[in-house]
Amino acid sequence: MNKSFICIDDFYEDPDSVRTFALEQEYETSGNYPGIRTVPHMTDSVEKIITDAINLNQTYNFNGQYCGSFQYTTAYDRSWVHADGTTEWAGVLYLTPDAPPSSGTGFFKFKEGGYTRYTGDKDMDKYIDKCSQDLTKWEKITEVANV
């Protein structure tokens, strides 16, 4: 069965120390996302939690471009709709204490065709990417709050 969302409560025993560690890192990587990121900091224990949670029964390369990276964003960072065409799953772990209720991650459907992921049609996918900054072309279908 394909799951859309998996929520893991209390992911870290001491999230405050992880947050302190994250804030002490160098943030210099920017890309197709708001804010800035660090180099990856994947640990064996985090890898095991993720592997067990999403039932990975094959070897997965956690040494990829962003696995385990910390990302720093502020209220001033502009967000947009985007997808990663080569990614089968994504994980987001919030470390902001007392975050505003409006923070979190939204999931959208492209109004033209109802797509929630890339189609595999290069021309259509390029068009969808081109529309990523025009929120009138998207419908928010759900949101995962920063709690």
Please state what every model-predicted region is.
Residues 1-81, 104, 111, 127:
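Non-heme Fe(II)/2-oxoglutarate
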Residues 73-147:
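Catalytic core of non-heme Fe(II) oxygenases with the double-stranded beta-helix
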